[in-house]
Amino acid sequence: MTSDTPQKSPAREPKPGVRSQISAPEKGSRDLIRWLWRDYLRHHLGFVILALILMSLEGAMLGALSYLIKPMFDKVLVAGQSDAVLWVALAVFGVFSLRALASFGQRVIMARVGQLVSAALQGDLVRHMLTLDGRFFQDNPPGTLIERTRGDSGAAANVWATVLSVAARDVISLLSLLAVAISVDWRWTLIAVAGAPLLALPITVLQNLVRRTSRSAREASARVSTRLDEIFHGATTIKLAGTERREAGRFQDEMSGMVHAQIKSVAGQAGIPALMDIVAGLGFFGVLLYGGQQIIDGTKTVGEFMSFFTAMALVFEPLRRLGNVSGAWQAARASLERLHAIFDERPSITTPKKPAALPVTADRADIRFENVAFAYADAPVLRGTTFTAEAGKTTALVGASGAGKSTLFHLMTRLADPVNGQITIGGVPTTKMDLVQLRGLYSVVSQDALLFDESLRDNVVMGAEADEAKLKKALDAAHVSEFALKLDHGLDTPVGPRGSGLSGGQRQRVAIARAVLRDRPVLLLDEATSALDAQSEKIVQEALEKLSEGRTSLVIAHRLSTIRNADKIVVMDKGRVVDEGTHDELLARGGLYADLYRLQYSEGKTVSDGSAGRAVSGPRQGDTGEDGKGSGLLAATSRMFGNVMGLFGRAKD
């Protein structure tokens, strides 16, 4: 027997290419069962065998019970043999006791293995999805991925218990009960089961219906989860727009679609045992006509008839379960096909077999963009972008929203790859570098500070090795210490889902402290001070400028006051570099930068470049001091996928 630790499945060979949406091509039942057994169930072989033995014992007891009906009627109730009362009673008690113990044992074992398999399957699924490209998370919203991870994995892991129950308990029950029935009268048995062949065609039709409707029901459930995710995360926007009734109506429409799909699926599953009951009724009708006359004629005893009647009545119970498991398997098969489709996804961005050595010091980490082009869904974002961010200096990127600034960051870190051109760091193309080592070159601070539902300390450290002295230095540099000391538990205070227990400015400071602590040779700042007030911005800006010293730094800024001291400013417009130089040089030449600068500071007002007319979002939960609360594992999964998607959400900027 194996340990209780969920087993990680062996490496699989998925099909190349990333699909734009998760598709679920039909797989053969044998292939799916083989996959489930090979990667998960076989790790619990000892417990599976024990469960099979207990199920077989439980099933055999039904045959024993029906067999005891004959002496109970003939010897005790009809003949009145007092000496037979005790042993018949003891035998019946023994049968019920053994059946109860076997049932208890196999149910506990099946539940245990089911939970372990479900945990292992979900763990493997999450690990695999985190290896996929950003496009996968853009094309598949969190609600869909949560439904796959929780709903489909649970259905796939639990179906094994139903299948094994039929394979062991119900098959043994069926055989033992049929043996008793045949021993009483084989002709009665033939009459009782004569209608069984009539079930073949309708059951096949219903099985296909169940598989289709189960797939539709799961897809509808995924749409409901996605809608809920959008509603809860966009509650402030909905309230400010006054669209509560509209969003509630859209959610109700999705719910209606899901309910309709689930009703069709349940109706298909319920139809199989219903048909079996009708055929069973016809069989009993024939046996009563034929066997009843034999009892009247005295050729059969009441005990024989009751034993046969009990056996055949019990036979149809495992047969009904067989019908149910057929429907349950078709539903689970749809889930397994969807899971298999995700496992078949393969990242297009991978580490080369022989990665090049990395430039690990700041004086070698110059970054060169050479004729870089990129597009989203055939919509060009970058068009032949070429410039150099010199080693050890600060390069700022400015331009209207949609100019492609944030896309450059995504390409640098290989969250996506350019469709043309190349990016080099220290003269080495990023596509030839080890992915983990490449991303390890960067400290990143974006305008969307992504925090996890952990302590403040954990959100700053984020897996980095740091002693208390280094941690304190980072906290002081980002001015996190100022508010951390006021929290109930200091650095050990949970920040809430997505950092909802902190204000927007506080979340931004935590992200900056995280970057300070990482202490990497390349610093990427994507509107890093956008969430701060003027006083905090000045303090943090000074800390960032100090952090930038001696590093290759790239800064995306809307407020041009924050990049006046940059060594070089690259001006972008519609995916192209239209100008570059220092602040003074660009102002002297005129052009787009000078226009943006005058726009921001005309009449003493600050207007973000390209931000005029941008919709104003409502206050974040953290700004009001409200604490968001998760809801167990489902909330944790939702937060994880939300945070992963947040990494890619601004890529088109």
Named regions from a protein language model:
Residues 220, 243, 267, 314-344:
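Cytosolic ends of transmembrane helices, especially the final helix of ABC transmembrane type-1 domains
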